[in-house]
């Protein structure tokens, strides 16, 4: 049962809209959260995912604000994080409310307009777009944005906490994200370093976390309104930085899992008080059916737990309608960038290796880069931004050059689609993810490097030796335990 501090309840009573009741707020805050997941459409369509998981006892209820999000009920207890489908990046375990900010960032109207302005089916809508996720870890929203962008354009994912950058990268790699650059900064620097650079920005701001009580009953046990004052000042500084980094005509989504006006509406109004008519609040009342139930007078979404039976959340859409003055002179460019553009001959040889070995075509909308004997694939829009700030990691590592030929990297196999794979059974996939070699019943001619897959989606690379598949899974990805569904 949730532990409520009386000061917190008094604060909620002040901010709760008149059409909602405290009784419902307390009742829903004490209910366990429904399990929710998001299908990773970089790897599988949600229809195919439903077809794959329904025989395994999954029941799906669509989440109205995310076309790839579902509340799920399972007919058997299983550690979802240890299932093969999770480890190969077919889905992300993500709270339903947290799927709202990326949806608001690329609401259907804007995607439709982008599609109308292209000659094809709109699949390249984002090819020249530059997007920033200011506070990214652990990566649920980052990977959702990447999927909405169809791995096109450039997504800069920033994380201030050094320990969380590693987790962020692991999730980005698992989900097959190829258009991402990771940075590790206090996000207050973006307004200075990347002034008017981004088409879209998500600021999922650090907050008091009041909306997460259904996940953590002790979250508000020691709640103190005075603790929020420092957080609010940080939030104001971050939203100012985000607005400065936004292009004219661009859109910013500000979100928190806090419930108070102080951390939400007041922060947005602070921005408007600074920049006046350059700040335009966009209405999210029609973002999805019944969005108006959570809509404020400004058009923000203030999601209370009882409205959609979810975590509490706040989402605001803000447009930059005119230029604003730069606060500081442009910083000097960073030097000593360790990568260089690959030469045309190097690119062709590498592309030939991927075609011949795995039937993989390297994407046209990316740039092959070289560092020592390593070959990387960078999203093309990052090239003009090199030197503006330091990057922890850009794009994906494709392969290492050997004395003869190349050695493909695991993350390249997960991010680049290939029709030619060596399909594994449940038990074989389990063995592979536990780092073991796979014995083959029928001996054949050695085939060298092969992509092994499960449910037609890649798991990694093995070396086909004729009588077995030698496991090439990176050691840090080897698992002690894999959860398999029992067959009824």
UniProtKB/Swiss-Prot annotation:
GO cellular component terms, semicolon-separated: cytoplasm
EC code: 2.1.1.178
Record-linked CDD domains: AdoMet_MTases (cd02440)
Pfam families per UniProt: Methyltr_RsmB-F, Methyltr_RsmF_N, Methyltranf_PUA, YebU_pre-PUA_dom
Gene Ontology annotations of biological process type: rRNA base methylation
Main location as per UniProt: cytoplasm
Biological role: Specifically methylates the cytosine at position 1407 (m5C1407) of 16S rRNA.
Protein name: Ribosomal RNA small subunit methyltransferase F
Organism of this sequence: Shewanella pealeana (strain ATCC 700345 / ANG-SQ1)
Gene designation: rsmF
